[in-house]
Structures are given as structure tokens and as C-alpha cells.
């Protein structure tokens, strides 16, 4: 099992199963929605517009049983860390400071004052915990492991070796810890080992600054163009501020809209926190999702604007999946 920053899992089936075996778990980068259109999915469930901040839920799909004569014997899992707080203090402090100043000047509308209260509440909970796992995030991984254990009990027989690894980010390590503690509680006879090390980063969360600099050299102009297409803050500014002259002089409207949308998304990561759903129209939520989704496509996908090659940074991860599974199959162990 590997823990880092996305969620995907793989299950191998075979006609043999030994009592002793291996399970590999990971945590890394988020995946995108497929099937019906994104607009339709977000329309049915606006929380999905949060993108990488979506507090993922237990899947409801019915699983296809193994073919007759086959039974599960090995799991290779790669999962994102659980829900978290925003990574930097300024992500809370900048919009909060702007809103406090506007409130002192008496230019906030009733909705603007409501936004101020929500931002202040989110900032207070996150203080000193920037980038860390939330209680909801830990619970997500306990539930994930619980589902896996009960769906595939054959894989988790006594003595099975669970090799759990994470990146060195606190949120990834604590996600791994939550999952492993849950698993050990479900079967104390499992042999669970954990590792959080830079040594595993080359495949769990590989980075190549020179490669990225070469293929993302136009990042500033690309994002300015994306903002001009997807971010239209004029209506929202009128909803929040009484004085358009004040906004023109003191507010970067595009940045504020994106900052508030990010805070709206991250509000899902906590229990009982208010959100900013009253602030964005359905069209604005979809447009802002498109803006953020484009960023992922540009930086991590086959975008022609980044030479259609950024996905190749995940080669080491794919190789690890294949090599680990091949080793397990060849050894005739879980």
C-alpha cells in the first residue's frame, strides 16, 4: 500500500492463494471524473466542483465478482491523502485581511459580511495546521481500509505482509497511519510494516524541476489566458461590495474570486464548517472547476501547451506497479 497525494487501486486475481503474502499501498495525485459530462456531474453534485478538495465519499457502485474459479490474492493500492487544510497561511490570511479592511470601511454588503464570517471560521480552525490532515481525512482512510478488508478477506489472512509506504508529507504519513492502525485492529495477526522516506519519492511523487521548467516555461501567460476565459468576477463583486470604486482601487477581483472558491472547496474537508455555496452561481462553479481542471491538465497531462508529455513523470510509478505485482505473482505469495 502506498500513500501520497490521488486515489486509485488495482486488484489481481489468480487461481492460487497462499497464507503468507504482500499488499502494497500508496498515496499520490488526484484523478478526474469520467463517464457523463463534468457539467452534468457537477450539476447533480456541486461539491464536485471543488476538484482536488472534494471530500471523497465511499463508492456506491456494485462490484463485479471474480470469475468462477478465481479468488483475490494480492492488492496494489495507490491513494491520495485524506482531506486536509490549505497548505499556506496566506491562503486564509490574504482574503481575510482584505475583507476585514473592507468591513472597517463599511463597503461590505450583507452577503459580504457573511463571507467574512465563513472565511474567519475556516481560518481559525486551520491556524497552525496548514497542509495537515483533518479529522475527516483520517476517517476517510479508516473507512477505505475497512471496505477493502471486508470485500477481500482472502487477501488479509493471518501472517500476510502489508508493506505500507508514504511520502514524507505529514498529511500522507498520517493517512497511512490511520489506515494501518485500522487494518491491524481488523486482524492483529497481519505483519504490517510502514515507511515514510524521501527514498520512495522517485516513484510515489517524482519531481524533475529541469523537465518541468522546460515544458512549463510559458506558465504565467498560459494561466493569464485561462483566467480570462474562465474567471469572471464582476457579478460576485457586486454581490459582496457596496462600492464599485473601492473594488477598483483596492481589490484584485480575479484573485479574490479564486481565493474564495478555494476556501469554499476546502470547507468540505472539515466537519461542521460553513461553506460559500451562496456566493457562486452554478455556471461560475463550473467555470472555476474548468479553470482548475485545466491547470491539472496543463501541468500533469498530455496538454499540447506543455508539449503533450507531462504525464511521463509518472513512469516510475507505473513501473513500480508492474514490477511489484510481477514479483508477487512469481513468488506464488499474496
Identify the residue ranges that each predicted region occupies.
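Bacterial Sec-dependent N-terminal signal peptides
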Residues: 3-38
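Signature for phosphate-centric chemistry
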Residues: 36-161, 169-333
Amino acid at each position: 500500500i502506498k500513500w501520497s497525494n490521488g486515489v486509485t487501486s488495482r486488484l489481481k486475481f489468480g487461481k492460487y492463494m497462499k497464507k503468507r503474502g504482500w499488499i502494497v499501498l500508496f498515496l499520490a495525485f488526484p484523478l478526474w471524473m469520467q463517464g457523463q459530462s463534468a457539467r452534468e456531474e457537477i450539476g447533480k453534485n456541486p461539491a464536485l466542483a471543488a476538484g482536488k478538495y472534494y471530500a471523497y465519499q465511499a463508492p456506491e457502485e456494485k462490484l463485479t465478482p471474480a470469475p468462477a474459479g478465481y479468488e483475490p490474492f494480492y492488492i496494489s493500492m495507490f491513494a491520495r491523502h485524506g482531506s486536509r487544510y490549505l497548505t499556506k497561511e496566506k491562503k486564509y490570511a490574504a482574503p481575510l485581511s482584505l475583507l476585514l479592511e473592507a468591513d472597517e470601511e463599511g463597503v461590505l454588503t450583507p452577503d459580504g459580511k457573511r463571507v467574512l464570517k465563513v472565511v474567519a471560521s475556516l481560518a481559525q480552525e486551520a491556524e497552525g495546521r496548514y497542509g495537515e490532515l483533518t479529522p475527516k481525512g483520517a476517517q476517510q482512510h479508516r473507512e477505505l481500509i475497512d471496505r477493502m478488508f471486508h470485500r477481500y478477506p482472502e487477501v488479509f489472512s493471518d501472517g500476510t505482509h502489508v508493506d505500507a509506504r508514504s511520502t514524507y508529507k505529514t498529511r500522507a504519513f498520517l493517512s497511512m497511519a490511520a489506515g494501518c492502525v485500522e487494518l491491524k485492529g481488523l486482524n492483529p495477526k497481519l505483519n504490517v510494516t510502514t515507511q515514510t522516506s524521501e527514498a520512495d519519492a522517485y516513484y510515489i511523487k517524482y519531481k524533475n524541476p529541469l523537465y518541468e521548467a522546460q515544458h512549463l516555461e510559458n506558465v504565467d501567460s498560459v494561466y493569464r489566458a485561462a483566467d480570462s476565459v474562465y474567471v469572471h468576477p464582476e457579478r460576485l463583486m457586486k454581490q459582496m461590495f457596496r462600492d464599485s470604486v473601492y473594488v477598483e482601487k483596492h481589490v484584485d477581483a480575479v484573485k479574490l474570486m479564486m481565493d474564495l472558491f478555494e476556501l469554499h472547496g476546502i470547507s468540505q474537508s472539515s466537519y461542521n464548517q460553513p461553506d460559500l455555496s451562496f456566493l457562486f452561481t452554478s455556471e461560475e462553479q463550473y467555470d472555476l472547476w474548468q479553470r482548475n481542471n485545466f491547470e491539472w491538465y496543463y501541468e500533469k497531462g498530455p496538454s499540447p501547451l506543455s508539449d503533450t508529455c507531462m504525464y511521463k513523470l509518472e513512469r516510475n510509478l507505473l513501473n513500480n506497479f508492474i514490477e511489484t505485482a510481477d514479483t508477487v505473482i512469481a513468488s506464488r505469495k499474496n
